[in-house]
Amino acid sequence: MTTRTPLMAGNWKMNLNHLEAIAHVQKLAFALADKDYDAVEVAVLAPFTDLRSVQTLVDGDKLKIKYGAQDISAHDGGAYTGEISGPMLAKLKCTYVAVGHSERRQYHAETDEIVNAKVKAAYKHGLTPILCVGEELDVREAGNHVEHTLAQVEGGLKDLAAEQAESVVIAYEPVWAIGTGKVCGADDAQEVCAAIRGKLAELYSQELADKVRIQYGGSVKSGNVAEIMAKPDIDGALVGGASLDSDEFVKIVRFRDQ
Ligand SMILES: O=C(CO)COP(=O)(O)O
C-alpha cells in the first residue's frame, strides 16, 4: 500500500485582501514552526490578488506552506478579460490550483468540458490541479451521488495521460455540506472517496489509483477532522470557512495531535 502524504489545504474563497493574507500566513507559519510537520503538507488557495504577497513571504522566509490559486483560465493568454492564465500562476510559483470548485460550476456555469480544459492548462504549466467534484443535495437524496461524482471525475480527467493523472489531487466536496455546517458523515465521505479511487483504477491502474490523494471538503472543522482523516481513502481536507481562522486551521492541520 502506497503511503500518501495528507494534503491539508485552506480555500480562502473571496476573503482576505493582500495585507490580511500576509498577516494570516505569518500566523500560520509561526504556529506551525515549533514542530516538524513534514508528515502533512499544508497549502493555502488564495485570491489572485494575494498570490504575489504570499509568494514573497513564503520565498523570503522559506516557509513550508505551499500556495495556489482558486481557478485558472483554459487559455494561455489573449483577449479574455478578467481571466488569469497558467503562465501567470506558474510565474508566481504556485504549486496548486483548484479546478471545478462547485462555486465555479454553479455561479460561472463551468461544465466538465471546461473543467477538463482547465485541468489540462494546469498541467501544461507545471501546476497541480485540485479537481473538485461532488453532488448537490437532490442528487444525494435520489441516491445518485456516487454515479454523479464519478462522472465528474471521468469528465475532468478526460484524455489525460497517466503521467499527469498520477499527481492530480481530487477533492470530494458534496455541495450540500459546503458552508452549511452540515458535514457529510465520515462513512459517507469514505464511500465516495473509495469509489473515486476505484474509478481511477478503472481509468488508469490500481497502482496509479493508490498514489492519488483524495481530499474531503465541506464544513471541516477541528472537531470533525480527525474522524474524517481516519478513513482509509481520505488523504486530506479542503477547508473553506474554518481556514480563515488561523488558530482553527492550525488545529485542523494538526489533526493527528487530537
Ligand atoms: O468549499 C469548500 C472548500 O473548497 C468547503 O467550504 P466550507 O469548509 O466552508 O464548508
From Swiss-Prot:
Q: Which InterPro entries match?
A: Aldolase_TIM, TIM_sf, TrioseP_Isoase_bac/euk, Triosephosphate_isomerase, Triosephosphate_isomerase_AS
Q: Which UniProt keywords apply?
A: Cytoplasm, Gluconeogenesis, Glycolysis, Isomerase
Q: What EC number(s) does its UniProt record assign?
A: 5.3.1.1
Protein location: Cytoplasm
Pfam families named in the record: TIM (PF00121)
Q: Where does substrate bind?
A: 11-13, 179, 219, 240-241
Any one Gene Ontology molecular-function term assigned to this protein's record: triose-phosphate isomerase activity
State if Cytoplasm is listed as a keyword.
Answer: yes
One GO BP on record is: glyceraldehyde-3-phosphate biosynthetic process
Which reaction equations make up its catalytic activity?
Answer: D-glyceraldehyde 3-phosphate = dihydroxyacetone phosphate
Q: What does the record give as the active site? A: 101 (electrophile), 173 (proton acceptor)
| Pathway(s) it belongs to | Carbohydrate biosynthesis; gluconeogenesis; Carbohydrate degradation; glycolysis; D-glyceraldehyde 3-phosphate from glycerone phosphate: step 1/1
Q: What cellular component GO annotations does this protein have?
A: cytosol
Q: What class of enzyme is it?
A: isomerase
Family designation: Belongs to the triosephosphate isomerase family.
This molecule's function is given as: Involved in the gluconeogenesis. Catalyzes stereospecifically the conversion of dihydroxyacetone phosphate (DHAP) to D-glyceraldehyde-3-phosphate (G3P).
Q: Which PANTHER family match?
A: TRIOSEPHOSPHATE ISOMERASE
Listed under subunit, the entry gives:
Homodimer.
Protein's name in the database: Triosephosphate isomerase
Provide the species name: Streptomyces coelicolor (strain ATCC BAA-471 / A3(2) / M145)
Q: What is the lineage of its organism?
A: Bacteria, Bacillati, Actinomycetota, Actinomycetes, Kitasatosporales
Q: Which gene encodes it?
A: tpiA
